[in-house]
Amino acid sequence: MHRFDYSKSAQKVMEPEVVSLLMAVQEYKGRVHVREQAAPALLETLREIAKIQSTEASNRIEGIVTTSPRLKALVQQKTTPRNRSEEEIAGYRDVLNTVHENYQYISPLPPYILQMHRDLYAYSGRGGEWKRTDNIISETDARGNRHVRFEPVPAYRTADAMESLCTAFREALQNRVAEPLVLIPLFILDFLCIHPFADGNGRMSRLLTTLLLNRSGYDVGRYISLEHIIDSAKEGYYGSLQASSAGWHENRADYVPFVRYFLGVLIKAYTELELRMNAVGTAKTSKPGRVKALFAQSLGPLKKSDIAEKCPDISLTTIERALHALQGEGYIVRIGKGRATAYVRKDA
């Protein structure tokens, strides 16, 4: 039976690489915090983009999708769900908003976690209770054969396991046995190994990640979608989960791969936020000049959508004019056709 000993688990993960990643996150956080007050309009725009991207990506990871126009309308609450997928998307939107707006009042305790799950499935009425039957985590190989990858905590032990998990985590934070950035991924991995719900465990784990980061003062997920970063590198996400969950029941789990992955996602998010703040921060640089600067900083091709994402305050029309001008100068060339069209620096 697994024991939730965060003092011991935290000590085991403090390898040189993890310490280096922790220091990098702290450094980025400090640099970004100093400049947050200087770009309120940008941050508001980034918040809206992050909401859409987070809702889309976290659901897409689980195979829950809709069209881009429908997704945007759902996130902006300009329409109502038409089917089960859209019900689950709308539920995620609501819980994500609650997490960002009221995180200081939502403790990581079983009653609150159950309420979050209830709201996640508010449009279908299927949430808000621990699993009643055992579940398994399986995978399909190249030949189409399904294999059991991990057997979570059985249903009859789930309530006790969640109580023990939350108590151990709360005590670890109160006693400061380790930095929150170490304790949070330990908690999330344990949550996923318990797999306490019949459905929605992956999405709940990402909502809980955002909640715990916000409560600890690391609110980069407000402006840069952590879910989007995870979705863009799902192989690393699932690989780290598999590596760290091995031997979990026998207290032999190696949390390091998942902690490394978690900190890497945060560094990517802070790096992206700093780049966007830098792009706006240079008042003397024109918008076309900022588009050109993106190509100077990029080693690979950029699509119009990439530029729009990195410079949300620049209109699509301005981006298209800048691209046309840069092609005329011979600074960039166009590659691909149709939706695959991208642009790359000529000397790249």
Residue ranges and their predicted role:
Residues 1-348:
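FIC/Doc superfamily catalytic core
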